[in-house]
């Protein structure tokens, strides 16, 4: 009875990923999205003697990270990381879209701003949206979406990144899109 009640809970759909939603299990996620390039289980450090921080050891937290190196979303090619909680439910998504120049980065950023905003407004449980600036130079946006019947807000960050230490022009400029649910 409890299992069927949990399955009937309306889940929040992801933006840019048509058939994915927060709260999915890894099994149902893999059925929709396919096999990952790499799956990593998070490890943390703890100390047997916490007072002196001596005798460290590693333990697995249970959180899973699914890495996809070659994905195509709405005509854009990039890579993505999906984070599953300790209870193995999808809780966060990060997508990176590399471009070759600053001008191409700005054009893609503008297109993603419009695409993400349209998709958010089209969500079935969309109620309202607030927008903040994010990024080093306030050149990105954080969309905070209130959803009907939910205590959590859907937050989507879209912002440019630039890695000056990278010699390759392909990996220097990227657009990053983060999605997660946040208690408000």
Where are these regions (language model features)?
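Post-signal-peptide N-terminal segment of Sec-exported extracytoplasmic proteins
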Residues: 24-57
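C-terminal motif of bacterial Sec signal peptides marking the signal peptidase cleavage site
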Residues: 3-5
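An acidic-aromatic pocket/loop used at catalytic or ligand-binding sites
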Residues: 98-100, 141-184
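Bacterial signal peptide processing site
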Residues: 7-9
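Short, recurring structural edge motifs at helix starts
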Residues: 13-19
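Structured segments of extracytoplasmic/periplasmic soluble domains
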Residues: 23, 32-39, 83, 115, ...
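Long, charged/polar, surface-exposed segments that mediate recognition or autoinhibition
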Residues: 69-140
């Amino acid at each position: 009875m409890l299992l069927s009640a949990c399955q009937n809970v309306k889940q929040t759909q992801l933006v840019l990923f048509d058939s994915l939603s927060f709260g999915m299990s890894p099994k149902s996620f893999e059925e929709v999205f396919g096999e990952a390039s790499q799956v990593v289980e998070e490890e943390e450090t703890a100390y047997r003697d916490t007072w002196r921080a001596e005798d460290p050891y590693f333990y697995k937290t249970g959180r899973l990270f699914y890495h996809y190196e070659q994905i195509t979303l709405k005509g854009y090619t990039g890579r993505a990381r999906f984070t599953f909680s300790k209870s193995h439910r999808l809780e966060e998504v990060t997508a990176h879209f590399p471009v070759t120049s600053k001008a191409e980065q700005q054009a893609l950023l503008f297109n993603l701003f419009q695409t993400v905003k349209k998709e958010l407004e089209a969500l079935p449980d969309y109620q309202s949206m607030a927008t903040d600036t994010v990024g080093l130079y306030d050149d990105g946006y954080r969309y905070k979406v209130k959803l009907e019947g939910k205590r959590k807000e859907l937050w989507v960050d879209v912002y440019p990144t630039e890695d000056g230490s990278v010699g390759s022009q392909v990996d220097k400029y990227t657009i990053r899109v983060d999605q997660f649910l946040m208690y408000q």
